[in-house]
C-alpha cells in the first residue's frame, strides 16, 4: 500500500520515469516532494501509475542541498 510510505524517501517509478523523492500526503492528495528547489513537486493524480521500486536507507541534510542521498 503506497500510503504506508508517507514521509519515506524512496525510488519511485511514475509515468515510466524514475525519481528519488519523498512521498507526501496532504489533504488526501499524494505528492512526490523534490529535494532540489529547482524542480517542482509532482502531484500524483492516478495512484496506479505510481510504484515504489525501493527505499532509500540513508539520507541527511547538507548546506548546498536540502538532503544528501546515498
Language model regions located:
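Acidic/glycine-rich C-terminal interaction modules and beta/coil loop segments
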Residues: 1-70
Amino acid at each position: 500500500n503506497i500510503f504506508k510510505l508517507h514521509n519515506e524517501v524512496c525510488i519511485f517509478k511514475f509515468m515510466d520515469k524514475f525519481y528519488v523523492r519523498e512521498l507526501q500526503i496532504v489533504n488526501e492528495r499524494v505528492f512526490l516532494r523534490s529535494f532540489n528547489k529547482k524542480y517542482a513537486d509532482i502531484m500524483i493524480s492516478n495512484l496506479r501509475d505510481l510504484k515504489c521500486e525501493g527505499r532509500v536507507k540513508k539520507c541527511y541534510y547538507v548546506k548546498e542541498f536540502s538532503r544528501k542521498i546515498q
